[in-house]
Amino acid sequence: TKHRYISRDEFKKILSTPMYDNRLELARRAFIFSCLTGLAYVDIQLLHPHHIGMNAEGRRYIRINRKKTKVEAFIPLHPIAEQILSLYNTADDEQPVFPLPNRDALWFEIHELGVIIGKDDNLSYHQSRHSFGTFLISADIPIESIAKMMGHSSIRTTQGYARITDDKISKDMDKLMERRKKQSTGEKTNKSN
């Protein structure tokens, strides 16, 4: 399957663009949280305070069985993910952490978020999970660790992320070479003036 994900630049735009509307802001925060944890929408809906723990070094993490695979995901928390958590319910285990409606109800807000940041194609919630996998692969995190964080039942699923980033890296390198070529020819003409 072709995993669709957002670029780092698109992620930075989403991070730096707080929304004027409460529902849109909730959608934005949930999307960012998923980009930083790899949790699917349904898993974020099911996230309760007891899924959040702290290790001996004081590092917070999420430990949750994924609804789709029933496989445990173990995710050390990024500081921005911790910041988002602090805005929601991390105390009352009777309630989920995030007050999320069903996924289809937030479809419009996620789409709108894509429009606001100027994304060329439709932004979908699932791209956030794929982006998490892609960001980790790009950061040279071992595939076994990524599989554990994403709650994949098979390492082969995780390897799909490695394939797309290889393709993307090749394309990006081609673009870079093309730009360099243009710059070097452009510089020569400037120097002769």
Question: What is each of the regions a protein language model found here?
Answer:
Residues I32, L36, V42-D43, E112, ...:
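C-terminal catalytic core of tyrosine-transesterase DNA break-rejoin enzymes
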Residues T1-Y41:
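Basic, Lys/Arg- and aromatic-enriched nucleic-acid-binding interface segment
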Residues T1, E10-K13, T37, L46-I84:
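Conserved tyrosine-mediated DNA breakage-rejoining catalytic core shared by Y-recombinases
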Residues Y5, R66-K70, E82, R103, ...:
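Catalytic-site neighborhood detector that most strongly recognizes the C-terminal catalytic loop/helix
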Residues H51-G58, D120-D121, I141-G160, K171, ...:
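Short, polar N-cap/turn motifs at the start of nucleic acid-interacting alpha helices
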Residues L26-R28, L100-D104, D120-D140:
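Short basic/aromatic active-site micro-motif
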Residues L176-N193:
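C-terminal secondary-structure termini that scaffold catalytic or DNA-interacting sites
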Residues H78-D120:
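Active-site/catalytic core of tyrosine-dependent DNA strand-transfer enzymes
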